[in-house]
A protein has these predicted regions:
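Activation segment signature within eukaryotic-like protein kinase domains
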Residues: 58-59
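A short, aromatic-enriched beta-strand patch in the conserved N-lobe beta-sheet
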Residues: 20-21
Length: 264
């Protein structure tokens, strides 16, 4: 229900748009706009790691989406390349708000959720979290876009969590990641949430003013005036699914009779 309620009040060029909802005896459905360029993970796997110019553009899309959500007290909690879809204009759309939650100003939430390699230390420690956890994840995203790897990767989730708790300053940065980008990543991935860039007094503008973004046209970007760095090949905007993941159709779901979805 949270995903439906949150999507219904969001209206941003950088976030998926909900058009309508409906249900049957087995499923509930969220009808959204289709973004036929595929997800960023697929693009990163085939064309990454990205140069700075491309990574800056894609991260800027996330910054705009986060700024819009955070101003409304909504924490996202599931940032990863798979949840960023490429529009035909080359811009990204933030999708899958299943973990998104409205948190009162000054408050925290305690649900353990997210993708292991992107989860912040305070979520791991069950210390309570807020929008600052999204900025931690943003730092992880920058690292992955520039290197095609996540900084705390390991063979199992427990070791990933242990690595994250040790902190970003013990992580080796490859030559693919320049000093300015490294500086931004470390500023976003501070262990203490109150010290993270984006969560301090200057808010998201502190990120926009970081030296990694020197010369970036934020005003033009905000109104979608900048050309997208990679334009997906889409022959038919009504049905070209070449960039989409194939759907599983072999799952048999029993009918729902509990009535939990009465108000959906």
């Amino acid at each position: 229900m949270d995903e439906k309620n949150i999507l219904s009040v969001l209206d941003s060029d950088f976030i998926v748009r909900l058009r309508m909802t409906f249900k049957d005896t087995k499923r509930v459905y969220l009808l959204t706009d289709a973004y036929l360029g595929g997800d960023l993970y697929r693009l990163l796997s085939s064309r990454g790691p990205f140069p700075d110019m491309v990574a800056k553009f894609y991260v800027a899309c996330v910054i705009e989406a986060f700024d819009y959500m955070h101003r409304r007290g909504i924490v996202y909690r599931d940032l990863k390349p798979e949840n960023l879809m490429l529009h035909q204009n080359g811009y990204l759309k933030l999708v899958d708000l299943g973990f998104a939650k409205k948190v009162p100003s000054g408050g925290k939430t305690y649900t353990f959720c997210g993708t292991p390699e992107y989860i912040s230390p305070e979520i791991i420690a069950n210390a309570g979290h807020n929008i600052a956890s999204d900025y931690w994840a943003l730092g992880i995203l920058i690292y992955e876009l520039l290197s095609r790897k996540t900084p705390f990767r390991a063979k199992d989730d427990l070791t990933v969590y242990e690595n994250a708790l040790k902190g970003i300053h013990g992580i080796h940065f490859s030559n693919r990641i320049g000093r300015k980008a490294e500086s931004l990543i470390k500023a976003l991935c501070r262990q203490l949430p109150i010290e993270r860039l984006g969560y301090q007094k200057g808010g998201v503008n502190d990120i926009k003013k970081h030296k990694w973004y020197s010369g970036f046209d934020w005003e033009g970007f905000h109104v979608l005036a900048l050309p997208g760095p990679i334009l997906p090949e889409i022959n038919d905007p009504m049905g070209d699914l070449r960039n989409a993941k194939p759907l599983r159709r072999d799952i048999d779901i029993p009918e729902e009779t509990s009535g939990w979805d009465a108000t959906f």
